[in-house]
């Protein structure tokens, strides 16, 4: 029973190390990734995309 547990831990560790492997380059999409609401003149909230 202990050998099965150790085997599962080794497999989980190996998969954890390789989970983030990818193409190695950043994606080409550079569009807006969020919105910040800032008060403009007159107290109206205007979305500012960054």
Curated annotation (Swiss-Prot):
Stated name of the protein: Gene 38 protein
Source organism of this protein record: Mycobacterium phage D29
């Amino acid at each position: 029973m202990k050998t099965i547990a150790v085997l599962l831990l080794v497999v989980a560790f190996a998969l954890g190390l390789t989970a983030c492997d990818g193409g190695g380059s950043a994606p080409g999409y550079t569009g807006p990734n969020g919105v910040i609401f800032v008060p403009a003149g007159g107290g109206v909230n205007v979305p500012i995309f960054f």
